[in-house]
Amino acid sequence: MRVVVQRVKRASVTIGGELHSSIGRGLLILLGVEESDELSELEWLVKKCANLRIFDDENGVMNRSLLDVGGEAMVVSQFTLLASTKKGNRPSYIRAAGHEVAVPMYEAFCRRFSEEVGRQVATGIFGADMQVELINDGPVTICMDTKNKE
């Protein structure tokens, strides 16, 4: 699994011209699921995202997590995070999981993340054409991959 975690002032998802979900201060998490991903990897990623200390403390130092600040969260599926641009100029998405793997993994991530942070997590709709708006705060953007835990 690969995620892009963005600290936001606010974020929203619109589908078909209708507002689907929105959050205030917190995290927007874009999640890409790889064909070879397993549920055992999900727990590491959930805990890492929930506990990332990327919010400022009283001294202006990024030392607080989403849990510490009581922020909101939104998780949006994004298979393009697994694009390969190794050959040619057209990205290949062959590593991205198909629906039969990706949907249950996405739903499990959302469910576990919601449990971890103790509140409902806003989402997009898997596979939908979505317009995602955000005000990136900082900007602070962190990329993580369960296959390369740096």
Could you tell me what each predicted segment is?
Residues 6-8, 69, 135-137:
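A short, compositionally biased micro-patch
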Residues 18-70, 77, 81-111, 116, ...:
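Compact, glycine-rich, soluble single-domain proteins
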Residues 28-32, 135-142:
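Short basic, glycine-rich beta-strand/loop surfaces that mediate nucleic-acid
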Residues 95-96, 137-150:
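Short, low-complexity, polybasic intrinsically disordered segments
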Residues 122-139:
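Short, active-site-adjacent segments that bind or coordinate small-molecule cofactors and metal centers
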